[in-house]
């Protein structure tokens, strides 16, 4: 095999892998908020993105942030309130207040439905 063939094959595999990775994650604009809006009237894309940002910024400080659909709604409702004080302690400030906690829980619900 020639060096050119190996190089071309490697580039092709890399490009296909990148395209597959980009297409596999839900983008924020592709999220369907219908279920969350039925459960939480007035829930908006702004609420979703705020909850998502709080989750991403705080819930991976001490451990990997879990996928929203990795736990049930009841499990999240049990664990998030227990984890918020630890996340705040790790941040050295109140990074997540009560309303932030609610936005995180609603984000997890919306992202898993």
Model-assigned labels for residue ranges:
Residues 2-11:
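Bacterial N-terminal signal peptides that target proteins for export
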Residues 14, 54:
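Flanking scaffold residues of small Cys/His-coordinated metal-binding clusters
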Residues 18-21:
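C-terminal motif of bacterial Sec signal peptides marking the signal peptidase cleavage site
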Residues 55, 80, 84, 105-108:
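Hydrophobic alpha-helical core bundles mediating ligand binding, dimerization, or RNAP-core interactions
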Residues 55-65, 104:
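The canonical Cys-X-X-Cys-His
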Residues 94-113:
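C-terminal capping alpha-helices of c-type cytochrome domains
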């Amino acid at each position: 095999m020639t060096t050119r063939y190996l190089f071309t094959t490697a580039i092709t595999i890399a490009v296909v892998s990148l395209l597959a990775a980009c297409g596999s994650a839900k983008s924020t604009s592709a999220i369907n908020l219908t279920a969350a809006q039925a459960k939480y009237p007035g829930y908006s894309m702004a609420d979703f993105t705020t909850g998502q940002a709080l989750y991403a910024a705080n819930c991976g400080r001490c451990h990997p942030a879990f996928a929203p659909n990795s736990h049930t709604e009841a499990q999240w409702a049990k664990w998030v309130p227990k984890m918020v004080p630890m996340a705040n302690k790790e941040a050295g400030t109140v990074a997540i207040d009560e309303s932030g906690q609610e936005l995180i829980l609603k984000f997890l619900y919306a992202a898993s439905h």
